[in-house]
Amino acid sequence: MLILYIIGGILILPVIYNLLFPLKKPELNNYFKTGQTYTSTGEGITQKILRQEGNKVFCELTLAPHAAGPPEHMHEHMHETISVVSGTLNYKLNGKEEQVGAGGRINFPAGAYHKMWNTTNNEVVLRSEKPEDFVPVEFVYSLDQLYPLMQSNGLTLKMFAKICVLDELFDSVPVGPPPVFFRIIKKVVKPYARIFGVKP
C-alpha cells in the first residue's frame, strides 16, 4: 500500500506543480539572426540560419566527413524536407537505407522514423531551398539549447532533463519507446527538472 501512495505522489506532483507554476514559453519572434550558427560536435553537424520568417526558420546543414548524424528519431507533427546542395548523404527512412546526391531532395514525413549520416571524406551540405522546407522556430530553438549539452556532456541526465522541460517545443521521439510513453515520461520528469533549475 505504501508503494502505491509513493507512486501516486510521484504521478500527481507534476499535475499540481504545472497547475500552480505554469511554464512560460520563451519569446521567439525574431530570435534568430541570419548567419547565426550552432554545432553538435558529437553528431558532426553545423546548422546555419538563413532567415527567420515569423515562426518559420530556414537553415543550411553541413555534415562533416564521416559525421554520425543524429540518433534515429521521428517527429510527431513536423514534416522534414530539404535539398542536398553538395556531397552524398546516407539516410534511413522507416528501416530502409538509401543514398542521395547533390540536386536530390529528402522528405521525412511526420511520424516516420529516420536518420541521416555521412560516410564520405567530403562535407555534405543540405539547404532549405523551397517554402515548404522551413523548420518550426520552436524546434530550432530546442536544438540551439541542446547542442551545447551534447557537445560537452553527451547523452546525460542533464540533457534528458532539458528535453523534458522543452517538452512539446522539441518535437522529436527517439526510436525505441512508444511515443505515448515518451510523452508521459517527459510530463512526469518536467516539474522535478524545473525544481532543480532547468529552464526551456
Summary of predicted features, one role per range:
Residues I82:
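Structured binding elements
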Residues M1-T46, L50-K56, A67-E72, E76-M78, ...:
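Jelly-roll (double-stranded beta-helix
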Residues V85-S86:
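A cytosolic small-molecule/anion-sensing beta-strand core signal
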Residues V57-L63:
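Short, well-ordered beta-strand segments enriched in hydrophobic/aromatic residues
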